[in-house]
Structures are given as C-alpha cells and as structure tokens.
Amino acid sequence: LERAARAGIPGYVVARKDFASNREMTIALVDKLRELNIGLVVLAGFLHILTGEMVAAFPNAILNVHPALIPSFCGAGYYGLHVHEAALAYGVKLTGATVHFVNEEPDGGPIVLQKAVEILEGDTPEVLQRRVMEQAEWHILPQAVSLFCEGRLRVEGRIVHIL
C-alpha cells in the first residue's frame, strides 16, 4: 500500500479479520473491485483461498504466483515456506515458480508462465524461497501481467495460448 501511495495509486483494505468468514470477506472484496471497475486481479503473497464468488466475478482475470512448478507442491497447505520445505524434503533438483489463472481449485487454474530454479546443495527453505522469488517470481509475474494487459493470453480449457 505504501508503494502504491508513493506512485499515486489509490489503495483499499479489505481485511479478513473484519469478517466472520472467508466467504463474507470475498464478497466484500468482489463488491469493491466491481465498484472500481477492475479488469485484472493479481495475487502475490495472498494467503487466503478465494471463494467461488471471486472466481465467478473474474473468470480468467485473476493471476496468482505460486512458488513451485505446478503441479508439484501445490494445493491446500502448500504456501510460503511450506512449499520450499516440501521440495527440499522430497529431494527434487529443480523447483521454480508458476503464474496461473485462479479457478475454484487451489493452484489448479490454467498455467500462464513457469520458470525453473535449481536447488543447490545446502539450501535451506529460507534461502531457496529468496532465490525462487528473485530468479523466477519477480520475472514471470510482471511478464504475465503485461501479456494479460496487452490482450495476448487466450485460455482454452487448461491451456493458455500466448499470442
């Protein structure tokens, strides 16, 4: 919010703690986004599961960045450091990040972009998390947003075509 304010972009808060349920928060969020005539919702570090109301209001217009190469280490319970802990515990040699459209299944929407990151000997979850952010997430999320805003993404079922 501070960065947006410095750039002259208005910011609004719809806080989960202000609502009795996740559904109520999501409905309030949808109402605010519609009021502002928002065409794209970007989730980055958003750790709440959105309910069907949000997905229905913004079909193929919600982008999420996930810190793994979906379909690995994704879905319920796989967020933040948990993702990197799981990748290290499994012994995979590559991880990375995925930008995908949000649907009603956690981390289950059509994949827009992915970028791989090598796991190095001695990595900790914290070190790996930072490297995935720097080498993958921070590159592919703005790229996906640009593609969307340029009208260069076409979704057919699970497949996202880049035009």
Positions of the model-derived regions?
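One-carbon transfer enzymes
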Residues: L1-L163
